[in-house]
């Protein structure tokens, strides 16, 4: 029986396999749209559990969970990280064919085993944010940043010669587009202040 995700995942022809394994596989990753918090990179965060890694700030997963009817308590609310992880696992059966399923590949029957195994591995120093980035052969990360962000963590990373992965801010002005939000005018005031226009 073929494994779900082996070394040839998504490589359906011999040409695809040759191009990937002989040329692309060892190419460094330039991640121009990343949701990793630059503070977590600067501080080299060591996560306590898999929920913090997978669900902590991933609005794509949150949106999918909401579309599955999951109560907000289990998404951004006060449920425990374990409860949030279990709700995520329950939803994945509805994500077959979606990259969310490929990235996670678990269900409510395997949730406990995956939870325990991942959390055990996450305690190892080699699983800190910086070490995960380095092990993944990443050489550039562009974080998604609002125009009013201070970029203080980017400045700290730029001055840190112990970490040779370039971490740059990328333009993500979503809040500037949300004119229907009740706090839009407050946002414009913050934007004006950030631009030195007040």
Please tell me what each predicted stretch does.
Residues 2-29, 34-198:
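Metal-cofactor-binding active-site regions of metalloenzymes
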